[in-house]
Amino acid sequence: MSTNYAYTHGASSIPLLGETIDENLKKTVEKYPDQEALICAHQNYRATYREFYEQVIQVAKGLIALGVKRGDRVGVWSPNCYQWTLLQYATAKIGAILVNINPAYRTSELIYVINQSGLSVMFSALQFKSSNYKKMMDDAREFTDTIRKTIFWDKSWDHFLKEGERISDETLRKREGKVQFDDPVNIQYTSGTTGNPKGVTLSHHNILNNAYFIGIRMNYSHVDRVCIPVPFYHCFGMVIGNLACTVHGATMVIPNDSFDPVKTLETIERERCTSLYGVPTMFIAELQEMEQKTYDLSSLRTGVMAGSLCPPEIMKKVKEQMNMHEITICYGMTETSPVSTQTKIGAPFEKQIYSVGTIHDHLEIKIIDPETKATLKRGESGELCTRGYSVMLKYWNSPDATHQVLDEQRWMHTGDLAMMDEEGYLHISGRIKDLIIRGGENISPKEIEDFLYTYKGVMDAQVIGVPSEKYGEEIMAWIKPKEGVTITEEEIRDFCKDRIAHYKIPKYWKFVSEFPMTISGKIRKVEMREIAARELGLEPED
């Protein structure tokens, strides 16, 4: 195909890794046994690669003792902690599938994920912020029937490890010997435009190789110490974070159970971190904190900004004020393990700031006309498609949803509007789908709309994203009350509280008697966004 077309592939002299996550981790342990593997500052936890792997083995044996078989789904519902990381590698070791559960989920969302994935074992924190996980698990039991055992981060965790002591090394070796690199290893639930979250199913091959090439692009080695304040339940934390470290022998440094700019900066200073991750809002908070207090960030070199569109002005400040001269921007999605393109160290400054980089090794991308599906020319805007080793296996137990995004040629249709320039750099300009991205969180309008319908006075509800300087987008709900019914913003907010995750509760509300409609009777969300932006004094979307 002519280079005039918006198509490119990541030709590479570096071969893909044809091994499981555990096989790869063993190599790192053998090479760097005394190198620090994991530091969890908020738990006063430290482990070298030798110590870390010994604990992974303990957890793996505990899972076998619980009766976890190859292919069984094991849930983890917790903020960042060392136990989460041990489970990530232990489930991979024995061929189980780790199911990441968003710590902000409430009972109804938890029930859906348990039933949809068929979880057999759940690991969970007891409580975090306003979430009482133990109570929600108790409330969920009558609506689920697949979970055999729930283990919390308390004495039951200690007992779980103790039970694993009766499993022999030989039993463990037999189990790990059956694991194949194309086996599913992880299910991550991500919101789309069609309602309930979908279970993105990823293999060892998917995420191990993506982590490998992310690290190569950032020049990672065993001397790097990577500060990971982003959540593990996202690919950002567990793949770009944890896996990219272990595949290159670097150190995972976890500053806190959730993001805190002060603790993050203090941890970088104390642990001499060389790399820092975050969504744009995290970097904005860190820059604001640095105006109040001086931190020694001289050890920083690189990092990743991703999760939502990265404002060029913020990128400039991070490079200049945080000493992150080699920071990279990543673009991707959970369905692609997650990174498809990434800026390169040493690329022209403008390309590092105003694009999302170039294609990763061994992957392909193209820009197509959303209607005709024809490949467009460079410089033209259309839908971005990705193909290659990184594309997910499927949406768990959702063949129809899978076929909607994965075509016969295995192209992943992202729903994102993008443009490829003459040099092959990718520029993201928006989305075809109505998906809202608030501070890096994917939020389905339909999921919130369906929930709002359950409120007694609501006749109709429509949810849109409106521009936000801080989060990229905020949620706005337009409510059409039933005839003769008056609904206040306060009462419907109270209804949402503790029933859906806090980040899904709309910030803006508008009560209407009608919605803007097309002649054929379809609701015009484009016009709704224009009206909202005008009334709220916000910039309308392009």
Regions found by a protein language model. Name each.
Residues 33-36, 155-158, 165-189, 196, ...:
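Conserved pre-ATP/AMP-binding loop-to-beta segment of ANL
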Residues 250, 270-278, 287-351, 364:
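Gly/Ser/Thr-rich phosphate-binding loop
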